[in-house]
Amino acid sequence: SSDLDFYCYKGLTVFEMDDRAVVELDGGKYTVEQALEKGPQYAKIYISLGINELGYFNDEAFHQTFGDFLKQVKASQPGAVVYLENLVPVNAEKCAANKQPYYVNNDRVAAYNAIFPQLAEEYQVVLLDVADALTDENGILPADATVDGVHFTKAWYQKWLAYLMEHTVDADCYAAGQTAAEGANET
């Protein structure tokens, strides 16, 4: 659909939202943060970041930087419902077979997934539990759902999209929640 924009780039991390120009907009190239300021105002923003950061081994820096990014998104897109997606666990066997880096593992995914609920609460954004929706009964990505242990097959991308479309919040309720949270923070 022409009313969708994707701000994405291979290997992009939350640590680069304010300094890596990857978004083409009006003939220029901008960082994601700049594009969100200069570009259109969106009704919904979905944020899916974290797998490329697994090798940083600094959960505090991840938390802080992600929080700064969420604050910036909300400031530049005040009318948007912001959805934060957690990380889908990987398939260890397929990761090994495809020579994924050693740090791309479910212990690291779990460490970051423990941070997302804190971020959602701190910054009053909607947390989407894509991890639960896209894993098997053991909490891992099924082998037939992934091409390399991390990235999905076409069918699994479609399952992800269906989950996102089925798990939305009413924009007016979201806005009311933002206002209530601001009031609570001022007391």
Model-assigned labels for residue ranges:
Residues 36, 70-75, 120:
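N-terminal cationic-hydrophobic initiation segments that often serve targeting/anchoring roles
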Residues 48-52, 74-109:
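Active-site segments of SGNH/GDSL-like serine hydrolases
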Residues 2-65:
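Conserved SGNH/GDSL esterase-like catalytic core that processes O-acyl groups on lipids
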Residues 90-187:
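Catalytic His-Asp segment of secreted/periplasmic serine-dependent ester chemistry enzymes
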Residues 40-45, 77-82, 123-126:
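Loop/turn elements at helix/coil->beta-strand transitions in domains of secreted/extracellular proteins
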Residues 66-70, 113:
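Generic structural signal for well-ordered alpha-helices
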Residues 19-21, 52-61, 70, 99-106, ...:
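Second-shell loop/turn segments in exported
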Residues 5-7, 83, 126-128:
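Hydrophobic/aromatic beta-strand patches that form the interior of the parallel beta-sheet core
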